[in-house]
Amino acid sequence: MAQERRGSREDRQNREERDSEFVDKLVAINRVAKVVKGGRRFGFAALVVVGDQKGRVGFGHGKAREVPEAIRKATEAAKRDLIFVPLRGGRTLHHDVNGRHGAGKVLLRSAKAGTGIIAGGPMRAVFETLGVHDVVAKSTGSSNPYNMVRATFDALKNQMHPKDIAAQRGMKYATLQARRVAAGAASEE
């Protein structure tokens, strides 16, 4: 029987090729302590955002006794939990959207070409790994990086492609696009 063994050279090469397409950003690193009978055991917790800069992004959390191991665990967790976000023109969001997690609230707004990423710390890392070039984001409430990242992902999960919105409303995509163009022209006047 000619079955491939787990951990074969081809398997490792495929995994390395798959991993090389992703960009990862370290969002936060914390020193954590576990209290045991003899005192405290110190370790590290890492929050990492991973994306392919083409619309797929994920975040992960990892804990270990050493920093590199915590980052590796967080990166693997992020790669296991990727979401796809439809982008307009491969550069911005299709529509404005709100997200929240705990006390953290975020507002994400699509922006014109050339605007850049106007977002604070953890949200900026999410947009850079997602592949968004133009976006305006505002976070209120909690400034905890974990809550900000989770609130941003909550908002991104609610992002819908106009074709899906048209299908949901029972109208044609062209009609929806015509309304969008007309609304854009009216707002410029």
Curated annotation (Swiss-Prot):
GO biological process: translation
Gene3D superfamilies per record: 3.30.160.20, 3.30.230.10
GO molecular function, one term: structural constituent of ribosome
Entry keyword set: Ribonucleoprotein, Ribosomal protein, RNA-binding, rRNA-binding
InterPro entries xref list: Ribosomal_Su5_D2-typ_SF, Ribosomal_uS5, Ribosomal_uS5_bac-type, Ribosomal_uS5_C, Ribosomal_uS5_N, Ribosomal_uS5_N_CS, Ribsml_uS5_D2-typ_fold_subgr
Comment text on domains: The N-terminal domain interacts with the head of the 30S subunit; the C-terminal domain interacts with the body and contacts protein S4. The interaction surface between S4 and S5 is involved in control of translational fidelity.
Family: Belongs to the universal ribosomal protein uS5 family.
Protein's UniProt name: Small ribosomal subunit protein uS5
UniProt source species: Sinorhizobium fredii (strain NBRC 101917 / NGR234)
